[in-house]
C-alpha cells in the first residue's frame, strides 16, 4: 500500500442529478490521480449469470477479491487517514460495485467517483450498514473509477470493506454518454405524456431494479396496515443477487429522452418467490425505508380472479429506458396463472419484465412475465414493428405466499387502494362548491352535484 503525507484539502466535485441514500459532503480529492493505485479488472473472471431473455442484460459481472484499505493508496494524517483506490475495466461505459463485506465505522465516509470528476456517489457511512453486511452501488460513469475512504485512525481496526464483484456496463444503461438516445423514441409513451395524466400515482409506484448485470421493472406495493413497509413486487425470473432500485428514472417532457432527478437505494431481502415457469412472482423488501423526498407511491392491488377487462395500463422501463406507459389493451384472456393480452399502444420488451399492469380501479393485477414473440435486436424498433400478446403473472396466484406481508392485519380483503403517506383514501365529492361536498374526502368519486 502506497502512503503519502499531505496537509491540504483540494477541490469539491460536481454531481449529476442523481442520488443514492447518502449523507452529504463531498470527496476530499486531495491527491494527484497519478499517485493512485489502480487495479485493472481481469475480464477472464466473468460470472455467468444466465439471465432470462426478458431481463435486459446491460453489463458483465466480474469476480474480484479486493480488500479496499489494504490495496489503496493512503494519505496519512495525525488523526484520520484517507484511502484512494482506482478500479479500471477497459471499455466500460460505467461501473458499479458489490461489497460482500460492508461495515463502516461511526465516523467513516466513503465516496465513489469517476476519474474525470464529473459525478460522485456518497457519502456512505455507518447508516448504510445493514444486517446482510453487503452493499451494491448504482453505476458511476467511466471505465476508471475511484473509491475514496476517510476514517479516523483509531477506527480502522473495526472497518470492513471488501469488494467481490465489479459490474461492467457495456450498454450505457443510464445514457451517460448519449449512446442510447436513438432507442428512446420507441412505441411506448413517456410517462410525462398526456396518456399518463390519470395515472400519476401509479407512475410513482413503478421502479427499475438492477442486479446480476440485468435490469427489470417492479412496483412498490401497499399492505393492509398502510404502514409504508418498503415492499416491492416483480417477477421471479428477475430475482437474485444484490439489487439496486432506481426511483423516478423518467423524462420530464413527453418528447424528452433524458431523465430529471432520480434516486436509488440498494440492499434488499427476498420474502417470497415463485417458480417462474408456473408462478412468476417475487416479493422483496428494501433494507431501509424509502425517504419521503423520493415521492414514492405504494400501489394498491386486487387479488380478484375475475377478468380485469381491457381498460388497463402497463407502466414499465422497457429496454431499461426512462419510464414508459402502454395502454389500449385488447384480447384480455386467462391462461392458468397468467393474464394474456396485447396493447394497441406500446409493447412489453426485455427490461419491462416484472412491471405491473393496473386495472380500471388503478390496482395491480399482474406482473409482466413473458411475450408471445421471438426475442430480437436490443433496439425497441424490432418489437414495436410487431403486434403480439403479453403474459402477466396473476397477482391472485401469488397471494397464498405473500399474504402474510401484504395483509398483516388478517383482514382477508380482496383489494386495497394505494397510498403516499400511510393514510387510506376517502372517496366522495371534493368540489367545495357542490351541494354534496364532503370535506373529509381525499379522492373525488364523480358524485358531485
Language-model segments: residues:
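Bacterial Sec-dependent N-terminal signal peptides
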Residues: 1-24
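Primarily marks secretory-pathway-exposed extracellular/lumenal segments that are disulfide-
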Residues: 14-19, 416-449
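A short aromatic-anchored loop/beta-hairpin motif
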Residues: 20-88, 168-187, 192
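Short, surface-exposed beta-strand/strand-loop-strand elements in extracellular ectodomains
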Residues: 103-118
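Beta-sandwich interaction modules
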Residues: 116-146, 150-155
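Serine endopeptidase catalytic core focused on the charge-relay Asp
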Residues: 140-215, 219-341
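Catalytic nucleophile loop of clan PA
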Residues: 219-229, 346-368
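C-terminal subregion of chymotrypsin/trypsin-like serine protease catalytic domains
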Residues: 232, 258-265, 274, 358-425
Amino acid at each position: 500500500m502506497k502512503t503519502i503525507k499531505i496537509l491540504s484539502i483540494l477541490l469539491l466535485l460536481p454531481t449529476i442529478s442523481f442520488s443514492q441514500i447518502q449523507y452529504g459532503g463531498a470527496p476530499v480529492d486531495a491527491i494527484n490521480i497519478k499517485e493512485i493505485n489502480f487495479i485493472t479488472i481481469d475480464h477472464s473472471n466473468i460470472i455467468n449469470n444466465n439471465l432470462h431473455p426478458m431481463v435486459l442484460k446491460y453489463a458483465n459481472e466480474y469476480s474480484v477479491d479486493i480488500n479496499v484499505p489494504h490495496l489503496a493508496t493512503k494519505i496519512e494524517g495525525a488523526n484520520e487517514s484517507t484511502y484512494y483506490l482506482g478500479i479500471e475495466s477497459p471499455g466500460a461505459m460505467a461501473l458499479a460495485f458489490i461489497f460482500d463485506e460492508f461495515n463502516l465505522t461511526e465516523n467513516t465516509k466513503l465516496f465513489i467517483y469517476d476519474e474525470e470528476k464529473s459525478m460522485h456517489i456518497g457519502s456512505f457511512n455507518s447508516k448504510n450498514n445493514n444486517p446482510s453486511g453487503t452493499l451494491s452501488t448504482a453505476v458511476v460513469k467511466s471505465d476508471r473509477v475511484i473509491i475514496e475512504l476517510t476514517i479516523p485512525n483509531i477506527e480502522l481496526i473495526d472497518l470492513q470493506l471488501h469488494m467481490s464483484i465489479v459490474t461492467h456496463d457495456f450498454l450505457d444503461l443510464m445514457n451517460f454518454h448519449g449512446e442510447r438516445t436513438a432507442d428512446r423514441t420507441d412505441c411506448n409513451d413517456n410517462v410525462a405524456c398526456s396518456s399518463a395524466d390519470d395515472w400519476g400515482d401509479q407512475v410513482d409506484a413503478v421502479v427499475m431494479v438492477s442486479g446480476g448485470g440485468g435490469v427489470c421493472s417492479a412496483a412498490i406495493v401497499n399492505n393492509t396496515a398502510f404502514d409504508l413497509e418498503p415492499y416491492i413486487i416483480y417477477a421471479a425470473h428477475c430475482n437474485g443477487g444484490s439489487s439496486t432500485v432506481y426511483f423516478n428514472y423518467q423524462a420530464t417532457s413527453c418528447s424528452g429522452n433524458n431523465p430529471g432527478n432520480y434516486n436509488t437505494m440498494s440492499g434488499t431481502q427476498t420474502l417470497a418467490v415463485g417458480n417462474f415457469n408456473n408462478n412468476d412472482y417475487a416479493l422483496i423488501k428494501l433494507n431501509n425505508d424509502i425517504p419521503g423526498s423520493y415521492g414514492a407511491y405504494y400501489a394498491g392491488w386486487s387479488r380478484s380472479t375475475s377478468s380485469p377487462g381491457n381498460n388497463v395500463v402497463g407502466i414499465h422501463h422497457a429496454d431499461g429506458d426512462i419510464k414508459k406507459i402502454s395502454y389500449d389493451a385488447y384480447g384480455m384472456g386467462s391462461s392458468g396463472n397468467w393474464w394474456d393480452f396485447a396493447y394497441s399502444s406500446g409493447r412489453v420488451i426485455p427490461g419491462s419484465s416484472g412491471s405491473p399492469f393496473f386495472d380500471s380501479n388503478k390496482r395491480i393485477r399482474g406482473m409482466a412475465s413473458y411475450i408471445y414473440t421471438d426475442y430480437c435486436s436490443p433496439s425497441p424498433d424490432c418489437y414495436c414493428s410487431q403486434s403480439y400478446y403479453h403474459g402477466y403473472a396473476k397477482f391472485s396466484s401469488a397471494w397464498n405466499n405473500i399474504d402474510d406481508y401484504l395483509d398483516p392485519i388478517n383482514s382477508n380483503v380482496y383489494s386495497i387502494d394505494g397510498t403516499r403517506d400511510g393514510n387510506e383514501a376517502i372517496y366522495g365529492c371534493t368540489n367545495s362548491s357542490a351541494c354534496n361536498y364532503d370535506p373529509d374526502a381525499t379522492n373525488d368519486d364523480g358524485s358531485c352535484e
